[in-house]
């Protein structure tokens, strides 16, 4: 960046840019925001705007690009969406009154995690995450600057940190420590996050609870410091810090949520086709955000779940009142975001009108809730603060037709301020007064064509042609002489003109001051507004769940302490909604106290994955307090759900299907408890047949013997069905089929016992493969099945069985005993649970060489 022969203005730019090297600097110059040097070159490419230079004739012209100030937000949005930061430098004084270079300062740094204004507003949360590490545990804090939500927790390991960042869908992560190279790669390359750094802790006793751990305090304090440093103002809308524990919610990884299509469809990345889409009958932006939060974090507290259920039941039982409630909620605007705009000093008249309209609806909403006459609903009603004094202030102060911008005037209602009313009367009636003066002087002077005109230089004046100069009255005074006429004024006209000019100038200034005063008054209500927002959002979500339950004929689930799963005629709620009730085939799911694993076999395309997802969605809906898609449901409370459903390679991180399978399986068996739910679909298909079968069997045995979690394990390894002989808590189920005249019909119903055939060739037939190919496949299958009849599948004892199984007559796995002894010794020293997937594969390869 050359600094030779630069102007004072450019020196000012360079001095400011030096403090913001990692951000695009938008430098206000008149009606444009300008960018210079490397910023200009890069912005011209990213924003598709023209690139020019400030001093074209110089030896080294300075690259320059600019955007109009009135449309700058859309360009800022593009840069933020691409993961960049933007520093906005404004003119801090009127250029006309400035001595020398106009004073400029950065007034805000906008980052992907601190977006408040946007040309394309989104109702979803935008969380900025901060992470700190004390050498033992991680502190993780997050904030939505646009709503003021502020939370913190502590986590045991980086895997949990990564999962929480993914669940929050953060775009920017603030770090208070140095990452390892592997962690840096994960966050930047795999998760595409913008990393920022902060060392200073912001201490605010009003926001941060002293009961937190040290690492939680530093994470939250550094987050606050970063937000204040970038926003450069006091933020009165920031809420008191809330501490939460991951264990207080049903734990699910981002991969699990994605595979279950909870908040967006994994295939389209759209809301349509997700559980969020199904359950969203909310009427407010606040309700939409809260619903998504409930889906992301189902509860584990039975008491809290039952409270939600009870209110939904009350709403279901009162259709008319619930309909009135839904209609009233339609008039509620986004109080959280409006409050933040007030706090940021960006609220315009339209924002205050929306706030006033919302407050006007609150008494009606409160009255409707009272009409339900229910103790559980009354708890919500008692906490509703209607803020009548604020509603009255806005209603009496802000003109209902006020423009969106403060500078246009016509903001304040007539009758609110006497001085403003006087000025408006002068402006409104002044033209009439001038017309009266014109008529009076025309008649008195006898100048028939006498008229009053106006221009900026001379103001109001009498226009008199040269032919009538002899008739000019004595009280006229000359203001200007033209070739064919003269311009005159009078004391009376000057007085009226002075009053009108004063009224115009003072009215605009006074109206601005009044609006600022009103906005400052509104800011004092922010805490009460935020509490009201939470209650209205909760009411909105509960009425939404009631509407969905009634529309789709859902039932109220029950919970037990017996570790029993009973789902009668259950449905996959989302698939049913897409297909239609008439087309969907329901399935019952049953786990008694003794059963921990269902091993499900059956052909592809027959409904195994849907059956598994059905159980997961039923659990999630039930534990978020929703009613569920079934005839009857009785569930234990789960603490976590682990899934491996789907076989897409993780191409971004360079991990194969098999590696992803093993990593997700490892997370499940390490973290699951006997109160967890595990869903594994076709685990082991990403490697060779015998490797896959061996690993699948070992994982099933491990879950059975050591974990005890309720598990559905879908497999195409039919040999694994023999495990039910030795594993007492495992039962076989299969997808039923109907064979008739050589054709196979998949019934999509789950039945007891193992499947007797794979029907893979029939699936290929449905897919339309050539007949000659199918015939050849059938011949090969027949030969393989014949060969397999003469080959015994060897049952390898698990670790809980006697190590002397070979001596008890079981077939030896190896041909000679010496080699078997060598392999047995190698196996005994392997610490499977502490091996990485790569180490496991290497060890397996070494063992294979011993055969």
Swiss-Prot record:
NCBIfam families: mutS1, PRK05399.1
GO cellular component: cytosol
Keyword terms, alphabetized: ATP-binding, DNA damage, DNA repair, DNA-binding, Nucleotide-binding
Descriptive protein name: DNA mismatch repair protein MutS
Function: This protein is involved in the repair of mismatches in DNA. It is possible that it carries out the mismatch recognition step. This protein has a weak ATPase activity.
Similarity annotation: Belongs to the DNA mismatch repair MutS family.
Gene behind this protein: mutS
Keyword DNA damage: yes
Binding locations of ATP: 602-609
């Amino acid at each position: 960046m050359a600094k030779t022969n630069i102007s004072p203005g450019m020196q000012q730019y360079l001095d400011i840019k030096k403090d913001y090297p990692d951000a695009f600097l938008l430098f206000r110059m008149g009606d444009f925001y300008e960018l210079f040097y490397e910023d200009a070159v890069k912005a011209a490419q990213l924003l598709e705007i023209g690139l020019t230079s400030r001093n074209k004739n110089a030896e080294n012209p300075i690259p320059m690009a600019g955007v109009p100030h009135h449309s700058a937000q859309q360009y800022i949005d593009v840069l933020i969406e691409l993961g960049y930061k933007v520093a906005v430098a404004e003119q801090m004084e009127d250029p006309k009154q400035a001595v020398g270079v106009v004073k400029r300062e950065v007034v805000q740094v906008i980052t992907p995690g601190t977006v408040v204004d946007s040309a394309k507003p989104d109702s979803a949360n935008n969380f900025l995450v901060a992470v700190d590490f004390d050498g033992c545990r991680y502190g993780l804090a997050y904030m939505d600057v646009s709503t003021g939500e502020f939370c913190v927790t502590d986590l045991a390991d980086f895997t949990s940190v990564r999962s929480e960042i993914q669940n929050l869908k953060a775009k920017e992560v603030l770090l208070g420590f140095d990452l390892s190279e592997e962690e840096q790669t994960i966050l930047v390359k795999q998760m595409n996050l913008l990393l920022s750094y902060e060392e200073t802790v912001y201490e605010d006793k009003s926001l941060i609870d002293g009961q937190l751990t040290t690492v939680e305090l530093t994470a939250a304090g550094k987050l606050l410091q970063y937000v204040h440093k970038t926003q450069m103002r006091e933020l009165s809308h920031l809420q008191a810090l809330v501490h939460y524990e991951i264990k207080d919610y049903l734990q699910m990884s981002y991969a699990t949520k994605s595979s279950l299509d909870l908040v967006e469809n994994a295939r389209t990345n759209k809301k349509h086709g997700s559980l969020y889409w199904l359950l969203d009958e909310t009427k407010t932006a606040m309700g939409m955000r809260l619903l998504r939060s409930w889906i992301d974090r189902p509860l584990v507290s039975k008491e809290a779940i039952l409270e939600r259920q009870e209110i939904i039941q009350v709403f279901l039982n009162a259709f008319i009142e619930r309909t009135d409630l839904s209609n009233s909620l339609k008039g509620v605007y986004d109080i959280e975001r409006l409050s933040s705009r007030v706090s940021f000093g960006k609220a315009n008249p339209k924002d205050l009108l929306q706030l006033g309209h919302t407050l006007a609806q609150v008494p009606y909403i409160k009255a409707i809730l009272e009409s339900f006459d229910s103790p559980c609903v009354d708890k919500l009603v008692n906490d509703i603060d209607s803020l009548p004094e604020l509603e009255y202030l806005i209603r009496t102060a802000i003109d209902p037709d006020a423009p969106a911008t403060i500078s246009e005037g016509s903001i304040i209602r007539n009758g609110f301020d006497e001085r403003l009313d006087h000025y408006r009367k002068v402006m409104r009636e002044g033209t009439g007064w001038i017309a009266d003066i014109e008529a009076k002087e025309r008649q008195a002077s006898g100048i028939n064509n006498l008229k009053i005109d106006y221009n900026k230089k001379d103001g109001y004046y009498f226009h008199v042609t040269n032919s009538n100069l002899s008739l000019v009255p004595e009280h006229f005074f000359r203001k200007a002489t033209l070739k064919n006429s003269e311009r005159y004024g009078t004391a009376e006209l000057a007085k009226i003109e002075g009053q009108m000019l004063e009224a115009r100038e003072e009215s605009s200034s006074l109206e601005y001051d009044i609006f600022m005063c009103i906005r400052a008054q509104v800011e004092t209500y922010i805490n009460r507004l935020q509490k009201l927002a939470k209650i209205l959002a909760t009411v909105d979500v509960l009425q939404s769940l009631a509407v969905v339950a009634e529309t789709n004929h859902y039932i109220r689930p029950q919970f037990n302490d017996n570790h029993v799963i009973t789902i009668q005629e259950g449905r996959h709620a989302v698939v049913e909604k897409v297909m239609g009730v008439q087309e969907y085939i329901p399935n019952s799911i049953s786990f008694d106290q003794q059963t921990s694993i269902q091993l499900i076999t059956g052909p592809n395309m027959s409904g195994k994955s849907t059956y598994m997802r059905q159980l997961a969605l039923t659990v999630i809906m039930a534990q978020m307090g929703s009613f569920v898609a079934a005839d009857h449901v009785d569930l234990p409370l789960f603490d976590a759900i682990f899934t491996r459903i789907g076989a897409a390679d993780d191409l971004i991180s360079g991990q194969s299907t098999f590696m992803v399978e093993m990593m997700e399986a490892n997370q499940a068996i390490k973290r699951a408890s006997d109160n967890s739910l595990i869903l594994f679909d076709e685990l082991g298909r990403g490697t060779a047949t015998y490797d896959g079968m061996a690993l699948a069997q070992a994982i099933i045995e491990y879950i059975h013997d050591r974990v005890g979690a309720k598990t559905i394990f879908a497999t195409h390894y039919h040999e694994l069905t023999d495990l039910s002989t030795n594993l007492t808590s495992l039962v076989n189920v299969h997808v039923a089929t109907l064979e008739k005249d050589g054709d196979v019909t998949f019934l999509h119903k789950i039945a007891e016992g193992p499947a007797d055939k794979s029907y893979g060739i029939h699936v290929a037939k449905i897919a339309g493969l050539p007949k000659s190919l199918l015939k050849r496949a059938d011949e090969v299958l027949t030969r393989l099945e014949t060969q397999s009849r003469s080959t015994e599948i060897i049952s390898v004892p698990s670790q809980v069985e006697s190590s002397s199984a070979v001596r008890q007559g079981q077939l030896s796995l190896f041909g000679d005993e010496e080699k078997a002894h060598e392999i047995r010794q190698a196996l005994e020293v392997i610490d499977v649970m502490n091996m990485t997937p790569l180490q496991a594969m290497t060890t397996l390869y070494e063992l294979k060489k011993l055969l």
